[in-house]
Amino acid sequence: MNKAELIDVLTTKMGTDRRQATAAVENVVDTIVRAVHKGDSVTITGFGVFEQRRRAARVARNPRTGETVKVKPTSVPAFRPGAQFKAVISGAQKLPADGPAVKRGVTAGPAKKAAKKAPAKKAAAKKTATKAAAKKAPAKKAATKAPAKKAATKAPAKKAATKAPAKKAATKAPAKKAAAKAPAKKAATKAPAKKAAAKKAPAKKGRR
């Protein structure tokens, strides 16, 4: 909406001619600009505050050349929207179909109610979180206790396991001794066989 469109809307709402609506808009704007220029603030309840803000000296950069430029301290106009204006735009407050969009005294009710309701929900969330933590703590204690019992039962099993290999080793020792004996007997039986072969050789020589 531009200035001309704003004047048209005011002409219809005020039920007056265009000249009077134009004068009303221009006078309002002129008054705000002059007051802010002086350093004063213009407050419209429910709508917002027009004020002057002071900016300190700073260092900026030229976007074209990339050079560093020193900016002197300056004053800029600023607008702070009111609580009721914010509530209407955000949807927290319903915009009335008829009458003024913002009224004096309407802001305090919904804004305070919403502010009080939020901490209540936060406190409830904290309460449930502490309850959950309290329930969770015994579960952890029980979990740590269970492995302790398991370890206690496991200890005798290890002792038995170490005994078993000892018996096995004891039985294995005679087996090796027997194995060593066996080749000795074989060697003993093999020796006469060679002797017999030596005796047989001279017999062949005599026949020739």
UniProtKB/Swiss-Prot annotation:
Family note: Belongs to the bacterial histone-like protein family. Long actinobacterial subfamily.
Lineage summary: Bacteria, Bacillati, Actinomycetota, Actinomycetes, Mycobacteriales
Stimuli inducing this protein: Expressed at high levels after a shift to 10 degrees Celsius; visible after 2-3 hours rises until it reaches 20-25% of cellular protein (at protein level). Induced in 10-day old anaerobic dormant culture (at protein level). Transcribed at high levels in logarithmic growth, decreases in stationary phase.
Presence of keyword Secreted: yes
Pfam families reported in the protein's UniProt record: Bac_DNA_binding
Region (Bacterial histone-like domain): 1-90
Descriptive protein name: DNA-binding protein HupB
Activity regulation behaviour: Trans-stilbene derivative 4,4'-[(E)-ethene-1,2 diylbis({5[(phenylcarbonyl)amino]benzene-2,1-diyl}sulfonylimino)] dibenzoic acid (SD1) inhibits DNA binding at 50 uM. SD1 does not inhibit growth in a range of 3-1600 uM.
Gene transcribed to yield this protein: hup
Bias-annotated ranges (Basic residues): 113-208
Assembly behavior: May form oligomers. Interacts with RNase E (rne).
Catalytic activity, EC: 1.16.3.1
Cellular compartment(s): Cytoplasm, Nucleoid; Secreted, Cell wall
Function: A nucleoid-associated protein (NAP) that plays a crucial role in local chromosome architecture. Helps organize newly replicated oriC proximal regions and contributes to the timing of replication initiation and coordinating replication with chromosome segregation. There are between 30,000-60,000 molecules in a log phase cell; the protein-DNA complex is dynamic during the cell cycle, with more complexes near the cell ends. Binds irregularly along the chromosome with higher binding near the origin of replication (oriC) and lowest binding near the chromosome terminus (ter). Has ferroxidase activity, converts Fe(2+) into Fe(3+). Binds Fe(3+) but not Fe(2+); prevents the generation of hydroxyl radicals by the Fenton reaction and thus protects DNA from damage. May function in iron storage.
